């Protein structure tokens, strides 16, 4: 019995050495599906560490670059001059040197008293929107201006209607600034020493 035990002990000793030799060779492990699963699992933590580090997040937007990116956007500036007599909307490029479109409330109404109305400002804004869309603009900044100086520093009634119409036009709106000129010195009102005679 000692011989059979010794004989049985010899193959048992040989089998663990073969199993230990197989993982070292590496060729049989690559073919087995069990071995490929840990490799995929090892790759997943590496991929999971990249978003945490922030390296994969900047790579994701370039994949969607053909659709829309900030580089593809064409921005302009909508200058809104609003007084109690009229509303003028002047669309330019970012430099302000090239006029894209211009319209006023007085063009869209027949009576002088309606030139500064919200309806006229909305019509003027819609005309500017159509022209800007035809020229490929995707968004713009808005600069609102009242008379300023020695006149009114509050925009007229058409300013809000014009801004709302521009916002509903489907463009991306950046900044909205009030660029009303304010005097910082002794600017003299017109009318002379005795003032305006009524």
UniProtKB/Swiss-Prot annotation:
Name the Gene Ontology biological process terms. translation
Check the record and name the PROSITE patterns matching this protein.
RIBOSOMAL_S11
Stretches assigned to coiled coil: none
Query: Which N-terminal residues, if any, form the signal peptide?
Result: none
Q: Where is this region: Disordered?
A: 1-72, 178-198
Q: Which GO terms describe its molecular function?
A: rRNA binding; structural constituent of ribosome
Q: Where is the composition biased (Low complexity)?
A: 1-11, 19-58
What keywords does the record list, in alphabetical order?
Answer: Ribonucleoprotein, Ribosomal protein, RNA-binding, rRNA-binding
Pfam assignment, any one: Ribosomal_S11
User: Could you name the Gene Ontology cellular component terms for this entry?
Assistant: ribonucleoprotein complex; ribosome
Basic residues bias: start-end ranges: 187-198
Share what the entry says about its subunit structure, partners included: Part of the 30S ribosomal subunit.
Question: Which family does the UniProt entry place this protein in?
Answer: Belongs to the universal ribosomal protein uS11 family.
Job description of the protein: Located on the platform of the 30S subunit.
**What PANTHER family does the entry give?**
40S RIBOSOMAL PROTEIN S14/30S RIBOSOMAL PROTEIN S11
Q: Name it.
A: Small ribosomal subunit protein uS11
What gene is this protein translated from?
A: rps11
